[in-house]
Amino acid sequence: MYAQKGVGFIISDIVRREDGTITSCFMRSDKEHHSFAVFLNDAVKLDHNCYETENWNDIRDWADHFSKSRITLWWGPGRHGPGDNLFFMVSDPDGNSVELSAEIEIVGADRKMGTWLHEERTLNYWGKGMLRVD
């Protein structure tokens, strides 16, 4: 994978189906769990942009801001398995998915790659997960 070999990203976690097919790969370039991720999907596209906030209170405040602007959260708030971060998703005016996230896992340089099962709970501990493929 170019992101790993060409750029130098380190794989933090992968998500696999029971048959072993990789459906997601989370990579890091610093101490945060991931700064880049790829997802198996039926279409070749940018999945989403993510913007980081500091903490749960920021997630709340941003959700309130979007509510006052009549922008609906279409996923979340929730907590991802890989990365253990808080999140929610909205759509921008062009229909692109935008994630706001906080409190992502901080990892040491010696952290081994983890493997997660491809299931809704992996993508959202608190509720419905958004599986890109079955």
Features from the language model and the residues they span:
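Core segments of cupin and vicinal oxygen chelate
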Residues: 1-33
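A short beta-turn/loop motif at secondary-structure boundaries
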Residues: 17-19, 41, 79-83
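Short beta-strand micro-motifs in enzyme catalytic cores
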Residues: 23-25, 47, 84-88
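Catalytic core of non-heme Fe(II) oxygenases with the double-stranded beta-helix
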Residues: 39-53
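Long, positively charged, glycine-interspersed low-complexity recognition regions
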Residues: 114-117
